[in-house]
């Protein structure tokens, strides 16, 4: 099961408090939004956190935010420092810090499975 690190400081981190303030919500709500963002990111983002080709409306939809408020929620995530705007969409800021162990684990498993397949194939050819 995929996972990401949820640090104990997230709930009261200045970035989280800023996000809550910008969206006129309490910090617990902001933490929930961030958990949605990060859990969705496990499937939607690349290893570097890149949400390539996705618009603000796409991000808002993934977070179950009303389409007419897409710019508000994504703008707040950018202003708070959780998303970075790129020329081709968005990047989840410091994504590798949150999900890096998952990507490393997936890579090790791929390599291990490939070695197993190679050994099996070599035995079959003997």
What function would you assign to each model-found segment?
Residues 101-125:
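Basic DNA-binding region of bZIP-type proteins
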């Amino acid at each position: 099961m995929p996972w990401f690190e949820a640090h104990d400081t997230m709930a009261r981190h200045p970035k989280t408090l800023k996000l809550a303030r910008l969206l006129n919500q309490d910090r617990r709500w902001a933490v929930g939004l961030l958990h949605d963002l990060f859990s969705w990111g496990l499937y939607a983002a690349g290893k570097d956190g890149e949400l390539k080709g996705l618009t603000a409306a796409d991000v808002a939809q993934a977070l179950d935010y009303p389409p007419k408020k897409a710019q508000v929620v994504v703008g707040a995530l950018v202003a708070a420092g959780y998303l970075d705007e790129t020329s081709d969409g968005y990047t989840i800021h410091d994504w590798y810090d949150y999900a890096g162990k998952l990507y490393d684990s997936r890579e090790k498993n791929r390599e291990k499975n490939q070695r197993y397949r190679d050994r099996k194939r070599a035995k079959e050819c003997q």
